[in-house]
């Protein structure tokens, strides 16, 4: 599915009545999220649906798809956890987190906390502006931009898939200061450091394959890293406004030491987040939608073509995904109720098999791993590497 999950673990059990009130208040500030996906003759489209966001007991499998005729967000509760599951059709991680953040602030207020004025929502109508639901891709689209260069196919993990439902999930908690210190020693950000660990572990798995298996596998290791474009192009949109960079190493050039990977990833990510190169990416995404012959293709044919393109031009080009929720900013009165956050990306497809989400809050950073295979070798090696760097790792039970 294209459903991702944001989870907040509170220090105390969730109070259902205050939470329901908070969700009802928050949805007034996000009316553009109260929509369902509809099928037209040429395109899918979003249509307003006058329903309230469901607050349900968290007992079913993670990131399951939304049924037809339903809203594309659900709120799930269990013990001391609140989870928001959202379809990527509706928004990206930043947009979904803004909604969850609003719920948490209102929840803490309902529980008796006094919220600073700058975080208060006294008038939902004044909070909603056209910029909140603008199509920012179209706003920053430029014509006559040269196309992106097609990338070669990448290495994929060799593990066998489980039978359905195959998606399992586990996470680990790491002291934020320790991982930050390790990254600072290398002169890079936490994201660059973790992407480098990801590539280093993939390299080790590749090198441990037997000769014939290694011969058959692609030698490009490449990680897809989503980028919040609001940090590059000014926008307050709550709709999707993210693209990705794909740092890589090429094992045809030989074995990479970890420091070599860090250096390479740092410079590749700097280059690929340059505004001009991001414009090429936006041009590719938006430009195809504007072509008359594309607009005139019936939806059933578009869906067939996109499904084929998804594998040939999509997941075949990268080996894994690492998405970092970024800095989490909350008023102290709300933050005091919270232990930590967990970010779970959409379940990986049959080709990718594993994905990784990162969330840092207060003194804790969580690493979550989604897995659709029989093996946990990747997660074990990833966390073992961090432990070898003297970074304490507290592993949580998988589900």
Where are these regions (language model features)?
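Alpha-helical hinge/cap motifs
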Residues: 88, 183-191
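Acyl-thioester-dependent acyl-group transfer interface
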Residues: 1-39, 49-74, 171, 204-399
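Histidine-centered acyl-transfer/condensation active-site motif
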Residues: 67-109, 120-130, 359-378
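Non-catalytic, low-complexity flexible loops and terminal extensions
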Residues: 90-98, 102-181, 386-399
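Short amphipathic alpha-helical segments
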Residues: 190-199
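Hydrophobic/aromatic-lined pockets within catalytic cores
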Residues: 91, 104-111, 184, 198-210, ...
């Amino acid at each position: 599915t294209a459903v991702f999950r944001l989870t907040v673990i509170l220090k105390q059990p969730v109070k259902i009545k205050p939470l329901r009130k908070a969700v009802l208040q928050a949805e007034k500030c996000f009316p553009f999220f109260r929509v369902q996906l509809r099928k037209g003759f040429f395109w899918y489209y979003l249509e307003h649906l006058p329903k309230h966001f469901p607050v349900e007991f968290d007992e079913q499998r993670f990131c399951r798809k939304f049924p037809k005729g339903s809203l594309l967000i659900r709120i799930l509760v269990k013990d001391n956890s609140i989870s928001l599951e959202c379809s990527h059709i509706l928004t990206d991680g930043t947009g979904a987190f803004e909604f969850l953040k609003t719920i948490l602030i209102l929840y803490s207020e309902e529980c008796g906390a006094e919220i600073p004025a700058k975080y208060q929502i006294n008038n939902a109508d004044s909070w909603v502006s056209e910029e909140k639901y603008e199509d920012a891709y179209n706003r920053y689209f430029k014509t006559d931009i040269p196309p992106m260069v097609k990338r070669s196919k990448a290495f994929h993990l060799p593990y066998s898939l489980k039978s359905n439902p195959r998606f399992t999930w586990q996470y680990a908690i790491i002291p934020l200061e320790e991982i930050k210190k390790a990254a600072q020693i290398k002169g890079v950000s936490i994201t660059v450091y973790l992407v480098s660990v990801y590539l280093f572990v993939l390299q080790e798995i590749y090198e441990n394959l037997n000769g014939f298996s290694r011969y058959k596998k692609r030698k490009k290791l490449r990680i897809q890293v989503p980028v919040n474009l609001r940090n590059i192009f000014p926008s307050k949109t709550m709709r999707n406004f993210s693209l990705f960079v794909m740092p890589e190493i090429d094992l045809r050039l030989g074995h990479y030491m970890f420091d070599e990977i860090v250096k390479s990833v740092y410079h590749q990510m700097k280059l690929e987040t340059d505004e001009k190169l991001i414009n090429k990416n936006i041009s590719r995404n938006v430009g195809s939608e504007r072509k008359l012959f594309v607009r005139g293709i019936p939806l059933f044919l578009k869906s067939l073509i996109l499904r084929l393109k998804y594998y040939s031009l999509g997941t075949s080009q990268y080996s894994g995904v690492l998405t970092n929720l970024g800095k989490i900013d909350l008023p102290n009165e709300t933050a005091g109720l919270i232990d930590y956050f967990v970010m779970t990306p959409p379940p990986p497809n049959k080709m990718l098999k594993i994905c990784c989400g990162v969330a840092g809050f207060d003194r804790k950073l969580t690493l979550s791993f989604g897995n659709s295979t029989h093996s946990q070798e990747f997660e074990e090696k990833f966390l073992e590497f961090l432990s070898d760097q003297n970074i304490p790792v507290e592993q949580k039970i998988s589900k």
